[in-house]
Amino acid sequence: MNEAVKTLDGWFCLHDFRSIDWAAWRELNPGNQELMLNELSHFLSDMEITKNIGEGEHTIYSILGQKADLVFFTLRDSLEALNEVENRFNKLAIADYLLPTYSYISVVELSNYLASHMAGGEDPYQNKGVRARLYPALPPKKHICFYPMSKKRDGADNWYMLPMEERQKLIRDHGLIGRSYAGKVQQIIGGSIGFDDYEWGVTLFSDDALEFKRIVTEMRFDEASARYAEFGSFFIGNLLPSENLSKLFTI
């Protein structure tokens, strides 16, 4: 049997995409709308406390197009904690007007294609660089891009039949492209084999949305992607600070 990749795993991730039911929201009187927005604000304040004590992260982006209106991206140290956030959110009154359109579950990961190199032989979980990747601080960048992807298992283009050494080389070459965008694009890779319909969820952050187009285009021509990658839907959005939520919902 081919050697399986080993991973270092960090925070669990939920990308929760919602569409606003504007027709139903318009039927509410302003007083009820205000009560719901205040309840949402208290919920987000509690999320901020969790973030400040280093036990998780979260952010909200406004999504363009008809796939969704919002994405709530939450990271926690266990599936139980992530599920608790999800359930509490769904119990908010405003959740009745935020219709689920898509979700993705993953765990931030580093594979042994890269992790041993980064750790330099020490316990990787004690390495500051590795920990920063596994338990990332989400940057307040203007734009987000999320997409799921998998590796092919088609005939000669079967990623899982390649020897470990060849996979390592392809991933390192692929990673060189990503590193060339340092300072322009921040990337979080969530492993989702056994968790969701694809094998990874990729989240990109940037202050220039065109950098998403540039990095994805360049990577498409790299062999690891050109021969072996399959992609799901792409979601693009703009940062939505919590203090701007009331403005969004004002009609």
From Swiss-Prot:
Details of cofactor binding? Fe-coproporphyrin III acts both as a substrate and a redox cofactor.
In alphabetical order, the GO MF annotations are: heme binding; metal ion binding; oxidoreductase activity, acting on the CH-CH group of donors, oxygen as acceptor; peroxidase activity
Give me any GO biological process, just one: heme B biosynthetic process
Pathway it acts in?
Answer: Porphyrin-containing compound metabolism; protoheme biosynthesis
Q: Superkingdom of this entry's organism?
A: Bacteria
Quote the catalytic residue positions: 147
HAMAP family in alphabetical order: Coproheme_decarbox_1
Name of protein = Coproheme decarboxylase
Native source organism of the sequence:
Listeria innocua serovar 6a (strain ATCC BAA-680 / CLIP 11262)
- What is this protein's gene name? chdC
